[in-house]
Amino acid sequence: MIFLETGNQFLGTERVSKLMRQYAIPCIISLLVGALYNIVDQIFIANASYLGSYGNAANTVVFPLTVVALAIAVMLGDGCCAFVSMALGRNEVDKAKQSVDNAVVLSVVSSLVLTAVYLIFANTIIAMFGGTVNEETFRHSQEYFFYITLGIPFYMFGQAMNPIIRADGNPKFAMISTLAGAAINIILDPIFIFVFKWGMMGAAVATVIGQVATAFFAVWYLLHMKIIKPASGDYALRGTVCGRMLTLGITSFLSQISLVAAMAAINNMLRKYGALDAVFGQEQYAQIPMAVVGIVMKFFQIVISIVVGMAAGCIPIVGYNMGAEKKLRVRELFTKLLIAEALVGAVALVMAEGFPRQLIAIFGAANESGYYTDFAVKAFRTYLCMMVLACVNKACFIFLQAVGKALTSTLLSMFREVVFGVGFALLLPVFFGLDGVLYSMPVSDILTFIISAIIIVKTYRELNVEGVQKV
């Protein structure tokens, strides 16, 4: 027997701005802390003189492969979160419970399959993501990838359960579980890298230990859920529930997996056109473009973690109010969300354009050549010049997913990352060389925003019409 407590009814009555703060802030912190796993690794790796830009480049190679795991996890977690929120809004508690059970099973099975694939085809996968730029980068990539792969099941489980915990009405616990894992990683990284001199292995092992801690927090919470209380371990997969849950989460998956495709294209174009450059064509500097773009992406990841945290934190609020047919509240939330996201983008833009050298210094620029710093300044100022539009686009993707417009959200996300992102990453270097890779992101964001603006206007109009989609 499972039952619904009255504690979630405030989602339909409390002030929207207060709900946004209550749900978005813990989600932002959770995502920021989650992002810190890889970012902290890269900071310590970059500042270790015996690793330097080779280690940074290796981190850039492996990073997209962890995003594949994240893509599957957030598809299950965000899809389940949206499903549960809408089901609870309609008081369909049985469906909510089944969705959680199925998400748990799918996260465990998919993580084990992905781990096996990574271990079997490691060298081929590393080469696909540009790891053959030079011998040192390839060697560091192999070492880092192997140990990171061992933590994939724990990483995926923790990430999948995080939005489910938020949907159960406990965003603070979701935040704490992620914080605990990241804190462990931050403490262990300098010990393993600088004291024990374990290099890339040390960075990876510190990350995995933190991920294990987060996964154990998630397991504990599943046994003590607040709103949905399972009485028995019925984890049989149900086609209808899984289908709807995966449909709601497919945008999160495609948003992440298409980013992987874009990063693969970018890494390979950096390798190809870097080899044709007078400076970066030299063996000792070949890894610099990849290392630098990896750093720029880490800054972008921090900003997008805030943006996605705001929007994803609002999924339970949107889902509940859509289920309860309170569309004017959803419209109000959408307005406030877009304004907040644009402000975040504006702050990020000022930082990227005005203080690139200070940002680069965090990632060990003092240990590198002048070529490294010069290219990094150019990369920050060019690659991130349309941050405001990028933030609004991302908010639009997730909001559409939250209101049940999975197809529209998916298509918009795919256009941004695959059609525009991958397309321009492959096309522009043909005309502009290495700089063309840097132009690909702002051009993609401008074109995507044109489509987003049209959809935003249409969505506003629809939120004035009575009626609601069924779960």
Language model segments and positions:
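Short runs within selected transmembrane alpha-helices of multi-pass transporters and secretion channels
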Residues: 30, 147-166, 174-182, 203-216, ...
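Helix-terminus/linker motif at the lipid-water interface of multi-pass membrane proteins
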Residues: 32, 36-57, 126-135, 191-198, ...
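Residue-level signal for short hydrophobic patches within transmembrane helices
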Residues: 17-36, 40, 65-72, 150, ...
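Transmembrane alpha-helix boundary and packing residues in multipass membrane permease domains
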Residues: 27, 31, 43, 82, ...
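Small-residue hotspots at the loop-to-helix junctions and early N-terminal turns
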Residues: 53-64, 141, 145, 204, ...
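Short alpha-helical transmembrane segments in multi-pass integral membrane proteins
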Residues: 1-24, 84-151, 195-250, 318-386, ...
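Transmembrane helical elements of multi-pass membrane transporters/channels
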Residues: 22-41, 147, 181, 210-214, ...
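Small-residue-rich hydrophobic transmembrane alpha-helices
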Residues: 56-116, 155-174, 290-350, 354-356, ...
